[in-house]
Amino acid sequence: MKSNVFILIFILFSIINLSFANEQTKKPQQPQQQQQTTSPVNKLEAKLFAPNDAKFSSYRVKLRDINTFNEIVQIPTKDGIFSFVNMSNGLYSLEIESMQYNFPHFKVDVLGKNKIKVRPAENETSILPLPLQIKATHRIPFFQQHVPFSIFSLVQNPMAISVLFTCALIFLLPKMMSFIEQDEETKEALKASTPALVQQLPEWPTITQKQLENKE
């Protein structure tokens, strides 16, 4: 009898454990809501290309509305990638501000839903492919290059010209004054010698009118 009782207790205990385990493993099935993925409208993607020392995280990309002058500023990633989404229809200017390299400017024309045309600012006839690839044109010199000394640079400098002209006047004015003084002295000497020269001239006989009448 005792063995049968133990067997019944063991069976009941095992049944209770199995039922509890089944309840724990069962999960209520909840209806999964399907999320509709919507792609952004009027998305402009671009990537910057520059030498390896370029720090794209310090750059600023400005998208300016030409009509309203509103600006949208983006910071590129470390790889130089940036994007603008949900752009309204209109004409925009795209500029990249950098202290390292110079980048070209672009004009962005949003015509409608996912209809974007990008053109260079200097050549409005050519349309660029998307996603846009922007390459640096040249490096911006941070320090001004030292210009070597040259005599022609002195001649072209207005300050140097004024100094040289002043020195020339200081040197030439005394010469001119001495020349003028010598000229005045010669004039005075000529005036003083003029009466003596007149006196040295021979006296020609004068013929009076009476002598002329007598001769006739």
From Swiss-Prot:
Residues 181-216 are cytoplasmic. Glycans are attached at residues 86, 123. This is ER membrane protein complex subunit 7 homolog. It is found in: Membrane. The keyword Transmembrane helix applies. Residues 1-21 form the signal peptide. It is a single-pass type I membrane protein. Pfam families: EMC7_beta-sandw. Its main location: membrane. Keywords: Glycoprotein, Membrane, Signal, Transmembrane, Transmembrane helix. GO terms for cellular component: EMC complex. Belongs to the EMC7 family. Residues 22-159 are extracellular. The chain crosses the membrane at residues 160-180. The keyword 4Fe-4S does not apply.
